[in-house]
Structures are given as C-alpha cells and as structure tokens.
Amino acid sequence: MITYEIPCLLGLEKLVADEVKRLGLQDVRAENGHILCRGSWADCARLNINLRCGARVIALLGQFPAQSFEELFQGVRAIAWEEFLPQDAAFPVKGYSISSQLHSVPACQSIIKKAMVERLRAHYGIEQFPETGTKYQVRFSVFKDQVSIGLDASGEGLYKRGYRAVGVEAPLRETLAAALVTLSRYRGRDPFCDPFCGSGTIPIEAALIAKNRAPGLDRRFDAQRWAFLPAEAWMDAADEAQDREFHGQYDIWGGDIDPRAVDIARDNARKAGVDDCVRFEVADAGKFHRDSPYGHLVTNPPYGERLMERQEAEELYRTFGKAWRTLPAGWRTLVLSSHTEFERCFGRPADRKRKLYNGMIKCDVFMYGNV
C-alpha cells in the first residue's frame, strides 16, 4: 500500500477528502492544506484522472522526524530510491519548511539531493548521474520537525485540465471553480448560471460535474512516464472514468459583459468537450434574471483589488444585488469575493459564509438559499 498526499487550497480539505473516499481509497485523513490516504499504485492513476478539487498527487516514500541535517540525510538515504528511479532519471527537489529547526529550504534541498545520490551511487555503481531521462520530481515538506518526502505524480497542477489555452485577466483556477460548484450541490438537474463568467471556468466545471466527466482525461501526468508504473493502470483508470459518464440535457449558462471573454469561454468549452451543454452570451449582470423556480447561481465577480477600483466593484455588487433579488426563492447562490463590504453592497447578509483562498487572496464564499 502506498500513502498519498493531496495538497489543496485551505478550506477545501473536506471536499477533497470526500472525493478520495468516493474513489475507494483507505485511511483518508483531512489535515490543514492536504489530504492523506492509502491505496495501490493503480490508484495513482485514478486519483490524478478523477480529482476535481485537489492540487496534485504525491506518492509519499518516507516520513520521519529530523531536527538536524544529519537526521535529514540519514532519513532520506534510508529510502529505497533505486526501486523507483532508473539510472538516467532526472530528480529535481522542491519543498518547504514551516515551524522547524531545518528552516532553510535551499539547504534541505541540497542535503536531500546529496543523500539520494549517495544511495543511488551505491546501487548503480557510478559516480555521476546524467539526469537526462524521465523526470521524477521529488517533493518534501518539513512541518514541526517532521519530514515527508515523495514523488510528485501529477507534474503540472491538477487545475490544468487542458482546456484553457488562453484566458482573461485574473482567471479562477479550475480546482476552485469545481469546489464552488460542488458546494452549491449542483448535480445537473436544475438551471445553472454564472453572470460574471469570464473565460467560462465555473460553467465549464459545472458541465463536467453534470456529465460526471473526469477532469483529467484530456491531459498528461508525469507518472505516466515512470517505468515502474504500468501503462495499463492509466488505461484502466481512463476506461473506468469514461464508463461512469452521464449523457443528458443540461441548462448551463454563462454571461459576461466583455465580448472577448465570451469568445474565449466558448472556445474553452469546445476544448473541454462540453460546448453541447453550455451557452455563453454577452450579458450585463446588473440585468440578470431567470423565471425558473429553482436553479443554481455560482459566480466570482471582480473584487476591486486587481480588475477594477474598489468603488466600481461596490457599485457592481449593488446593481447585481438588485437583479438577484428578482430571482424566485428556490435559487441557491454562491458568490466568491474578498471584498469585506460585499454583503452591505449586495443588499443582504449571507445565510452562510465559508472562508477560502483564491491563490493568495483570502476570500469568503457568501451562500444564499438552501446550501
């Protein structure tokens, strides 16, 4: 059994843990900023292909205490790296240290690399490693003097689904968009709307959820090139994911006042394979209205920190709030914003709030209705 670590945005731990449990992995534990679980090497492929809200998948190969560089060196050297890394492997080292005696990240990187080279040198009987072959990205963390180290199976972050070649300014990461849709409890039955859709990330993720389409089917992962992980694991995981897809009619809509953003959103939906069930239109959020008695509205309006001045954002919230109050009572609404005066400008306090981070920006999810 392999222990996997799945980093995630702060505030999304329970959502990611629920995803992992649904995939059938064992000993699932949610901790600050990451999930731990246990599974087989075949589960490495299943996690990468299916996770919507996790940041990446790391196969942990060692966990041990270390308060000195000697303890770090010995702990890393004790790991059987030769079972995973071929002679020509490229093995760069990345990581971080928090609240630990070993606080210098560059020094930790150097010690870890040195320990790995010594272990591999003893096995392969060579002095120099060319590192011209497949990349095996080593990732470590040192938290309160406890070291975790392993191989990054994802490569590029899982938010890179492969459908967004270009975007508009200040895009929302796909993993966070999927989390917002999940928090709204959207399942594909009711209308779904995003009146500030930008490059279309939230409606596209809603469509992937409605169709139960795995988000990682259209991209590559670093672990697909690892010699010890059979190609059949990836093919089986992809087949399993495709067998679970739904095919139906969905009412998913995105609007934005910027015509260029709408063009980009349509192109991204086509790349994601959901252009048959998502409509994008040039529209003013201040005039948004729907007559359907039930629906889901999930949106990420400008915060007034990057795209527009704070006063402009507040006026936008006021006009959008007036339009929102014309919706039937059965609508569930989630708005992601970092603006501390959002509720006052919007014209109604949230029924519930949840703290999240959009990149480095601390935000609240303002929830209205039965969510």
Predicted regions and their residues:
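A short, flexible beta-alpha/helix-coil linker loop
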Residues: 98-101, 157, 302-306
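Non-catalytic nucleic-acid substrate-recognition regions in nucleic-acid-modifying enzymes
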Residues: 1-134
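C-terminal edge-of-domain segments
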Residues: 138-154, 366
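Short beta-strand/turn micro-motifs composed of small residues
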Residues: 8, 256, 337
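SAM-dependent Rossmann-like transferase core, predominantly class I methyltransferases
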Residues: 149-185
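C-terminal catalytic and target-recognition region of SAM-dependent MTase-like enzymes
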Residues: 284-287, 291-371
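Conserved S-adenosyl-L-methionine
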Residues: 172-290, 305-306, 310-314
